[in-house]
Every structure is written in structure tokens, then in C-alpha cells.
């Protein structure tokens, strides 16, 4: 059995870093060592920023985004088209769409997808909040931007069913060939989706 070569504080730092998605035990050790070597330039400021985030970050009561204000800056941005809502599974999806910069719309974060096998039902997600937002009026389009998984498609169909009878256009993201992708490397499902979502040029 290997002997411990660091104190409990450093071990705790490594264990906590290893819980971050994308970091395993080895990567966590490297990250911890890098932070410790750059104690004044990185570890101190990171510790301060994390403390501030812990104290100030909240979930937007309107859309489910994370921010330091409620409602969040996306919901209060008068430059956005608040009549169009892009529905996403998670905050990371919202951030990804914002990086793309293709639309200047509002968002609604569901907090996951329906998954009966995992015990995730409609009441476990932020679906009621979405239905309430649409019911308030002023929404002309919902863009369902969930992942192309069975759970994502089930969630999209459930939302569509719940909004039947309301005067709102419901669309979903096109699925298909990625920019720069080669047809020979794509699976049959992706190719079929691309053919169905074809557009006029």
C-alpha cells in the first residue's frame, strides 16, 4: 500500500477536484499540483472566486439559468426577442447556444429530460414553469433544443402535447450533417435526420 505523501488538506483538494466532470483522480492531482505551484496567481484568486460564487449564484426563477441576479440578465435583456423561447436541457446547453450567437432569444432550462427508468418525471423538471410562461401570452415560438436522445425526444413530445391548443409555434432543432462533416463517417440515423431536415438553397 502506497504511503501518503501530502497532508489531509491537499488530499481533500484532490478528492474534490476529482468530482468535477472531466477530471479523474490523475487529472485532479495534476490540477491540484498546478494550483499549489501557482498559489498566489491561481489558487488564491480561484478560492476567492469560488467563495463569491457560493455566496451569490442563484437559479433564475423565470428561466432556470444560473446568475448572480434573479431574474437573470438573459430574462431582463430588452435587446432580446422575448417572444421566442429556446428550450434546453441544461444551463451548459444555453451557454453553448449563446456561444454560437445565431439567435437573440430568451431561454428556458428544463434541468434534464424525462426518464421513467431513472425515475425522472414531469414534476422533477422545470416543465410547469415553461407552460406557465407560454400561458401568460406574448410567446410566438418555442424552439425545442434538447439532445437527439430517446429521453430528449420523449421530453419534446411531452412538452408539445402539454401546449396543444395554445397559440404558439413549436419547432425543434434540425438534426443532421455537422459543419465540416463527411457523409461517409456519419451513422444511418444522422443521415436519415439530415435528409428529413433538408432545406432549399
From Swiss-Prot:
GO biological process: DNA recombination; DNA repair
Molecular function per GO: DNA binding; zinc ion binding
Superkingdom, natural source: Bacteria
Listed Pfam families: RecR_C, RecR_HhH, Toprim_4
UniProt entry keywords in alphabetical sequence: DNA damage, DNA recombination, DNA repair, Metal-binding, Zinc, Zinc-finger
InterPro entries, per database record: DNA_Rcmb_RecR, Rcmb_RecR, Rcmb_RecR_Znf, TOPRIM_dom, TOPRIM_RecR
Domain Toprim: 83-178
Keyword ATP-binding: no
DNA damage in keyword set: yes
Regions that span the bilayer: none
Zinc finger (C4-type): 60-75
Recorded family membership: Belongs to the RecR family.
Its job: May play a role in DNA repair. It seems to be involved in an RecBC-independent recombinational process of DNA repair. It may act with RecF and RecO.
Name this protein carries in UniProt: Recombination protein RecR
Source species of the chain: Rhizobium johnstonii (strain DSM 114642 / LMG 32736 / 3841)
Taxon lineage: Bacteria, Pseudomonadati, Pseudomonadota, Alphaproteobacteria, Hyphomicrobiales
Amino acid at each position: 500500500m502506497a504511503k501518503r505523501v501530502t497532508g489531509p488538506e491537499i488530499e481533500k483538494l484532490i478528492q474534490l477536484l476529482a468530482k468535477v466532470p472531466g477530471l479523474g483522480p490523475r487529472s485532479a492531482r495534476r490540477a491540484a499540483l498546478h494550483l499549489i505551484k501557482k498559489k498566489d496567481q491561481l489558487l488564491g484568486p480561484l478560492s476567492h472566486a469560488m467563495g463569491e460564487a457560493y455566496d451569490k449564484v442563484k437559479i433564475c426563477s423565470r428561466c432556470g439559468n444560473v446568475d448572480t441576479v434573479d431574474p437573470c440578465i438573459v430574462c431582463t435583456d430588452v435587446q432580446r426577442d422575448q417572444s421566442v423561447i429556446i428550450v434546453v436541457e441544461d444551463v451548459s446547453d444555453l451557454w453553448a447556444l449563446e456561444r454560437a450567437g445565431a439567435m437573440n432569444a430568451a431561454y428556458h432550462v428544463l434541468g434534464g429530460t424525462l426518464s421513467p427508468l431513472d425515475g425522472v418525471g414531469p414534476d422533477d423538471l422545470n416543465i410547469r414553469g415553461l407552460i406557465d410562461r407560454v400561458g401568460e401570452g406574448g410567446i410566438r415560438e418555442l424552439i425545442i433544443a434538447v439532445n437527439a436522445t430517446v429521453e430528449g425526444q420523449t421530453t419534446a413530445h411531452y412538452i408539445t402535447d402539454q401546449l396543444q391548443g395554445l397559440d404558439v409555434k413549436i419547432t425543434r432543432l434540425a438534426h443532421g450533417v455537422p459543419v465540416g462533416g463527411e457523409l461517409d463517417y456519419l451513422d444511418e440515423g444522422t443521415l436519415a435526420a439530415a435528409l428529413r431536415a433538408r432545406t432549399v438553397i
